[in-house]
Amino acid sequence: SVIEKKLDGDLSKFYYLGPMWRYERPQKGRFRQFFQAGVEVLGYPEGLAELELVSMICNLNKEFKINNPVLKINHLGNPETKEKFSRSLLDYLNPMKSDLNEKDLSRLKNNPLRVLDSKDPKTQEILKDAPSISDYLPKSSLELLLKIKKIFSEECNIKIDHNLVRGLDYYSGFVFESISSDLGAQDAYLGGGRYDNLCSQLGGKDMPAIGMAIGCLLYTSD
């Protein structure tokens, strides 16, 4: 919509709200039909936009009295960082391919970083000794994570999780998700990240962007 309306290239902030449906079988804490809200911040370079979104998340959790919220944050670096780390992770996991399930094998083939998102206990055990993206991140990326954690230390329970990659391949830079232990197998009710390269990949202008999606019913359910 941003590209169609020729809004790419401008400093813009958008929000949306509406019903959506899941194709896959919903797990505990999820519904077939659900309402989702989203926030997109376009044209703002890394730094201030991240602080604004984290502040919004802290306020939402407080306003809706979310039980035991934890905001997990990570940084995926730049394309070169992701490529180097991806190769290192692939080298580590290849000798243990026979221990991975079918879904994680597909992830390993198409995007090794997505294996970090696996919920399989066996895969998680294998990943305990895997390389960490923190070893490949530039100093500025690590400093941003520490800065966010420090600024909001009294408002949010923030955890730096270097295995957090999110489920969409277009994310670059800062990524995050907020979880609650009360929501079953799928405990993330909010998540997002920076996607600076997506607009140009879809035929629009090259511009920085960051956003998040919020599962609205999870904020209002008992």
Feature locations, PLM:
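TRNA-recognition modules of translation machinery and tRNA-sensing kinases, especially anticodon-binding
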Residues: 1-221
